C-alpha cells in the first residue's frame, strides 16, 4: 500500500446541509446497497475489488448522499483513494506472466538494478531464476507506487528487519499489493512458506501464479482486512503501508488487524511522503497514529527509519529472541 490523501469523512446524516437530505433509511435498503455495489463492480477499474469492501463504503455513502448517483460517485472516489491511485497500469495477469517468462521489451538495466540482480542471484531460494525473470520482476514492482518507492532501499529494508529476527519460516503479507515480488530479496529460511492477501482478485491471481513460478510454497487469497482481519498463523506478519488505508475506511481497523494477526512478530510501516513526493509532516503524524495503535498493549517495539518509510517491528511475546538495534537506521 501507499501514502494516501486524507479523505474527508462523509457528512453525518443528521447534519447534512440544506438541500442535501441524506438517503437515510432508504439508503440502508438492501436494494439500494446492491445497486451501488453492482454499479461499482461493473466498472473495469473496480471489477476485481472485494465486494465486501465496496459494500462497506457504499453503505456509508448511501447514508449521507441525496441519491444513488451521488452515492455511486462518492464510493468510486473513495475506492480510487484507497486502491486505484497506486497501480500505474491495470493489472493484466496474462501479459505480466508473459513478461516474466519472456523478459522482452524491458527498459535498460540501471546500476541500482544490477546491484539488486546480483543480490537475488546470490539467494539460494531463487538461484534457478534467470536474469531476465528478475529484471521483469523489478519492472513490475515499479508499477505499484508502494513497491516502487521501496526499490531504492529494498536490500537495506529487508536485511535490516530480518537481522533483528530469529529465522523466519512463515510470512503473512496483508494488503500485499506487489510486495510478494520482493521475495527474491528477502532473507527467508530455506523452508519458508509465504501467505499473501489483498482486496484485488486480479492482483491475487497474479501473485499466486508468481509464487508458483519461483517455487515458493504458500497461498494468495482475496481478503478484506476491514471485515475479516487476520490470516493463518505465521512467524512474521507484514502490514506494510496498510494501516493508514484501513484507518481511512474505518477508525480503529488498523489496531484490530494487528491485534488479530496470529504472529509473534508484526512489521507495521507507514509512508513518509505523498504520491507526489511531498513530506508534509507525515512521519510525525503516522508515528502518533502508531503510538495510539499500540497504547496499552504489552508489546515490545523497535523503530526503523528508511529513506521513504517509517517501520515498527512489534514483538508480541517477550519470551522470543530478537536482536535490538538502534531506533533509526
For the regions a protein language model found, what residue spans apply to each?
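Conserved SAM-binding motif I beta-strand of class I
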Residues: 193-198
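Conserved beta-strand signature within the Rossmann-like core of class I S-adenosyl-L-methionine
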Residues: 263-275
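S-adenosyl-L-methionine
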Residues: 205-236, 246
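A short SAM/SAH-binding and catalytic strip from SAM-dependent methyltransferases
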Residues: 183, 234-249
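Conserved Class I S-adenosyl-L-methionine-dependent methyltransferase catalytic core
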Residues: 58-165
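Conserved class I S-adenosyl-L-methionine
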Residues: 167-179
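Conserved SAM/SAH-binding beta-strand->alpha-helix loop
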Residues: 200-202
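Conserved SAM-binding loop of SAM-dependent methyltransferases across substrates and taxa
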Residues: 178-190
Amino acid at each position: 500500500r501507499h501514502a494516501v490523501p486524507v479523505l474527508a469523512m462523509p457528512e453525518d446524516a443528521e447534519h447534512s446541509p440544506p438541500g442535501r437530505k441524506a438517503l437515510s433509511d432508504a439508503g440502508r435498503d438492501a436494494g439500494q446497497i446492491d445497486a451501488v455495489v453492482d454499479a461499482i463492480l461493473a466498472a473495469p477499474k473496480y471489477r476485481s475489488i472485494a465486494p465486501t469492501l465496496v459494500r462497506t463504503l457504499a453503505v456509508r455513502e448511501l447514508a449521507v448522499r441525496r441519491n444513488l448517483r451521488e452515492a455511486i460517485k462518492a464510493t468510486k472516489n473513495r475506492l480510487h483513494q484507497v486502491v486505484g491511485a497506486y497501480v500505474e497500469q491495470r493489472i493484466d495477469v496474462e501479459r505480466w506472466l508473459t513478461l516474466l517468462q519472456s523478459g522482452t521489451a524491458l527498459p535498460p538495466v540501471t546500476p541500482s538494478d544490477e546491484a539488486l540482480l546480483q543480490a537475488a542471484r546470490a539467494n539460494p531460494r531463487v538461484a534457478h531464476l534467470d536474469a531476465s525473470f528478475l529484471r521483469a520482476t523489478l519492472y513490475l514492482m515499479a508499477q505499484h507506487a508502494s513497491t516502487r518507492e521501496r526499490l531504492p532501499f529494498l536490500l537495506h529494508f529487508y536485511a535490516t528487519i530480518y537481522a533483528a529476527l530469529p529465522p523466519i519460516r512463515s510470512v503473512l503479507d496483508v494488503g500485499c499489493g506487489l510486495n510478494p515480488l520482493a521475495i527474491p530479496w528477502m532473507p527467508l529460511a530455506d523452508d519458508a512458506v509465504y501467505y499473501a492477501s489483498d482486496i484485488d482478485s486480479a492482483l491475487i491471481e497474479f501473485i499466486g501464479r508468481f509464487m508458483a513460478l519461483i517455487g515458493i510454497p504458500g497461498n494468495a487469497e482475496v481478503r478484506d482486512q476491514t471485515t475479516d482481519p487476520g490470516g493463518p498463523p505465521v512467524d512474521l506478519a507484514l502490514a506494510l503501508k496498510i494501516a493508514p488505508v484501513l484507518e481511512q475506511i474505518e477508525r480503529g481497523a488498523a489496531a484490530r488487524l494487528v491485534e488479530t494477526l496470529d504472529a509473534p512478530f508484526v512489521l507495521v510501516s507507514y509512508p513518509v511522503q505523498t504520491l507526489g513526493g511531498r513530506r508534509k509532516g507525515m512521519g510525525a503524524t503516522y508515528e502518533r497514529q502508531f503510538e495510539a495503535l499500540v497504547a496499552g498493549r504489552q508489546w515490545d517495539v523497535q523503530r526503523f527509519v528508511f529513506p521513504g518509510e517509517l517501520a515498527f517491528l512489534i514483538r508480541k511475546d517477550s519470551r522470543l529472541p530478537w536482536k535490538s538495534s538502534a531506533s533509526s537506521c
